[in-house]
């Protein structure tokens, strides 16, 4: 999509003024890339930033969903517990069970997501430990995430998770190390920019955009780019780009209609022309 967009912009370069930046968002699936893009400073002088994500439409047609939201702030992290191995039958008292520490931490984290201010989520998606059935496990690793409908809620749930990890490690005499693997903030698109994009869709594609509210229910680190531009006085917007889809998200049979790539590039190029086109 980004290559097609760049080529389209190059072909209409004489009609543009100012500076148009085409930014690749790396490691989006793990919400690991956008923050580093923001820290580079490339967005500090940007007046408008647009991003999108493919989504499924009910009839499989190409569509633009402009009224998007529900981006959950999130933290992704790995935890390694270290204990001490010993013989499970002959000298279990000499061991420090890292598997039990990780299991207790998992149970504790999963029960601390309630928040009256909004939505909270926690998931431990992977737990590995041990070397054999007759060995007290000396090491355990879990991969987890916390989420919240606002950055504040997400931060509190993450803090509760860290408390659970620390307490579980102490209970079983283990040490632990937390490695942050990614994250995203919550954000809101600017209404004025959304209206511009909707008119571009009508004028350039000859179709009516889907303006019904669509909440993501997941996380998207493009929100860091949105916030960076907004904090510098600019406008930001994220949209869903509808197409047909096979298999559910994160399913091994997942696939999508690739015609959405050209469709999306036309939208982005048309928006750039509307926002940065020459007026004389």
Residue ranges and their predicted role:
Residues 1-5, 9-126, 131-137:
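Histidine/acidic-residue-rich, glycine-tolerant segments that coordinate divalent metal ions
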Residues 99-280:
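Metal-dependent amide/peptide-bond hydrolase catalytic core
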